Amino acid sequence: MRASVLSTLCAIGLALAAPAWAQELKVGDQAPNFKLQASDGKTYQLSDFKGKQAVVLAWFPAAFTRGCTIECKSLAEHGDQIKKYDVTYFMASVDPIEGEKGNKAFAEAHKADFPLLSDPTKETAKAYGVLNERGFANRWTFYIGKDGTITYIDKDVNAHLDTSAEYMAGKLGELKVAQRKTP
C-alpha cells in the first residue's frame, strides 16, 4: 500500500514537472521577449531589436561577486571586439537596479559601457530557464538572431570568464552575425 501511494505521488510529480522540461529553450526557438530596466536608466525590450539587430543576453548570478566581476570587466575592457558586429549585448541578473549591490552600481564600478539589465521579479530569468534553485540566474549566454530566434546558448561561460569579450566576438563571427558598417 505504502509503495503504491509513493508510486502514485511520484507519477503526479513527474506529470506536473513535465511541462517545465518541455519548455527548455533550445537553438531555433523564439527567444522570450523581455522588458527590463537597465543600468543606463533606459528600459529595453527584445522586441525593439527584432528585424534590426542581433542581441546577446549574458545572464550572471549576482553583482559584485568574483566571477561576475571578471566577466563584466572583460566585456567592459574588450567590448570593442564585440562592437565590430551589428549586435546589442547585455549582461542580466535578478539583482535590483538600484542600491549599493544593484546593477547600476556594479556597472559604474567596472566602467561598463553596455547596459546591465535587472530582473528583480525573476520572470524573465524563468522564461529563459536560467533561474536556479537558490533563486539566482545561471551564468548562461543567449545569442539571438535579428529574427528573434536563439542561434546559440553558451552554458559553459565559466570556462572563459576572463576572456568573455573575445569569446563572444569569436562566437558572433562563427554565427555569421553581420559586421557593423563603418562610415
Task: Give the role of each language-model region.
Residues 1-7:
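Positively charged n-region of N-terminal signal peptides that target proteins for export
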Residues 7-17:
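Bacterial N-terminal signal peptides
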Residues 21-47, 170:
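N-terminal "domain-start" segment that seeds a small globular fold
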Residues 35, 90, 103-139, 145:
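Short, internal strand/loop/helix patches
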Residues 45-69, 73:
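Short active-site neighborhood of thiol/selenol oxidoreductases, capturing the structured segment around
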Residues 47-49, 130, 156:
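Residue-level structural signal for beta-strand termini and adjacent loop
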Residues 69-110, 122-126:
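Structural microenvironment flanking redox-active thiols in thiol-disulfide oxidoreductases
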Residues 137-183:
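Thiol-/selenol-based redox modules, centered on thioredoxin-like
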